[in-house]
Design a protein with these regions (language model features):
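Formylglycine-dependent sulfatase
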Residues: 1-418, 423, 432-453, 484-521
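Residues forming the ATP-binding cleft of Hanks-type serine/threonine protein kinase domains
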Residues: 429
Length: 521
């Protein structure tokens, strides 16, 4: 295929979108007409998973096509090594313009990620990269110790327009402005490309759009909030009376984030705000699609809509992400393209690491053999794909849990291996809300052993977790394990004793927050 005949690619990635909170997934209240129309024009996946339910490692994984443990992307702030190939760089080197607008969460000195051009709104300095080998005082004393419960209680309405130094980013007020500005940039890019095509200068391109909604804080303009509050709210299962059978590591997370015992009015308020954020997000998706159609680009463009991870949204008495429940680690995924089936649903498990080979497949480029993912196109087209695994894999390394976890979804079961703790096991076909942990039942012992054996062909859990803890500064000079949740008295006592006082702070090279631009050469 000649370069001039290659289709274009648009990837729209939201942040923290619960996989079931869309109209095309059968949600009873949510208004997502643009995502619904996109799903009708393409294929949607019901078992799509993030490879890590945290922003930075998920994004570094899907742009490199490698699992987080392959690139040492453990948590927020882990920089991507400049030597790592990204699909954006591979396209650029092949002469295909790759453009990025909005959030990708690059840290360190590799800010462009190989994109030909980008325009991003740089966040506040709290997400600067931290050293690879130095324990980080800021990790325990800084953003990790924020009272996350307060974001729930403060959820609701914000002003439509705010002044924020023209950066469009304000954590206290939410990310509505960020997404409006980023969508403006994406629309301008499409106008440029549409005009070039009309002038006989057609060249293939790929555009990545990183939107912040519906990431916390749960703040949304009044008109979106009023669509749902107070009555159009689906109360989450197991929210008011959290399951007594929660895994002890999940209970650690619940306690660490202070999320227990939310009242029904508090839940209705925050969920209504979240729903409003989804509809606001959908409006921006609609603006991008409308511009594609206006420029006669829609029919010849591959479009991927996805999110970096999900949102617990009150299920199991939890909010945010980090755990292996489907609300957290599951993601929405829609793929539309020329000559692909319309209105199709696929239930086979897939993960976002497949994005890399999918984009290269569209572009007619080869994927390196060390990438664990596979293109979605043969699956969508109904072809044979003998190398595609029949499982989904995800992992988590951070201190909301005291122990790292690794997840497999296979044959209708979800298995989560916790380092130095018992596993969990759910039958997703019979128990889709994941209320009944089967791991302690004798009849599932063989299945647990089979799952663990499979996991160990993918990763060495103990070795990887030790490497992650060392990188994150959670192993002391004498081998002490500082994997502590933020509410632990021991954590506070260590800080009081000055254990971390001599350790390095964030490097200061990054500069002030604001709009950063790289223009195509």
């Amino acid at each position: 295929m000649s370069r001039s005949n290659q289709p274009n690619i648009v990837v729209i990635c939201s942040d923290q979108h619960h996989p079931l909170v869309s109209g095309y997934r059968g949600h009873p209240f949510i208004e997502t007409p643009n995502l619904d129309a996109l799903a009708a024009d393409g294929t949607h996946f019901t078992r799509a998973y993030s490879n890590c339910p945290v922003c930075t490692p998920s994004r570094m994984s899907f742009i490199t096509g490698k699992y987080p443990n392959q690139i040492d992307s453990w948590f927020l702030g882990c920089p991507l090594d400049r030597e790592e190939m990204t699909w954006s760089r591979k396209l650029d080197e092949a002469g295909i313009t790759s453009a990025m607008f909005g959030k990708m969460d690059f840290c360190g000195d590799y800010q462009d990620g190989g994109f030909s051009e980008y325009k991003i709104i740089k966040k506040r300095p709290a997400f600067k990269p931290y050293p690879r080998t130095t324990p980080l005082y800021s990790r325990l004393e800084g953003h990790v110790r924020v009272d996350k419960r307060q974001h729930i209680l403060n959820a609701g309405v914000r002003e439509e327009i705010v002044t924020d130094g023209d950066t469009g980013y304000n954590q206290d007020l939410g990310f509505y402005d960020h997404d409006r500005v980023v969508t403006d940039w994406a629309v301008d890019f499409l106008k440029r490309k549409g005009e070039g095509a009309n002038n006989g200068k057609r060249k293939p391109w790929a555009m990545y759009v990183g939107l912040m909604f519906p990431h916390w804080p749960y703040k949304v303009p009044q008109r979106y909030y009023d669509l749902y509050y107070p009555d159009k709210v689906a109360m989450p299962h197991d929210a008011l009376f959290p399951n007594d059978g929660l895994h002890p590591q999940v209970r650690n997370m619940q306690n660490a984030l202070g999320l227990g015992h939310l009242t029904e009015p508090e839940l209705r308020n925050v969920i209504a705000a979240y729903y409003g954020m989804i509809t606001a997000l959908d409006d921006n998706v609609g603006r991008i699609i409308a511009e594609l159609k206006a420029r006669n680009l829609y029919d010849d463009t591959y479009i991927v809509y996805m999110s970096d991870h999900g949102e617990n949204l009150g299920e199991h008495g939890l909010f945010y992400k980090q755990c292996s429940y489907d609300g957290s680690v599951g993601v929405p995924l829609i793929v539309k393209g020329p000559d692909l089936p319309k209105g199709q649903r696929i239930d086979r498990p897939v993960t976002l690491v497949d994005l890399y080979p999918t984009i290269l497949d569209i572009a007619g480029l080869e994927t390196e053999p060390d990438r664990p993912g596979n293109s979605w196109l043969p699956l969508i087209q109904g072809g044979e794909q003998p190398d595609r695994p029949d499982y989904a894999f995800s992992e988590y390394h951070g201190n909301f849990f005291k122990q790292d976890w690794y997840m497999l979804v296979k044959d209708g079961f979800k298995y989560t291996y916790y380092v130095n703790d018992r596993p969990s096991l759910f039958n997703l076909e019979e128990d889709p809300k994941e209320m009944h942990d089967l791991a302690e039942y004798e009849q599932y012992r063989d299945l647990l052993e089979t799952m663990e054996s499979l996991l160990r062909t993918i990763v060495d859990p103990e070795a990887v977790s030790l490497r992650a803890k060392r990188d994150l500064g959670l192993i002391g000079p004498n081998g002490e394990d500082y994997t502590l949740t933020m509410t632990d008295p021991e954590c506070k006592e260590l800080i009081k004793q000055g254990v971390f006082e001599d350790e390095a702070e964030f490097p200061q090279w990054e500069g002030a927050p604001g709009i950063w631009v790289k223009e195509e050469q």
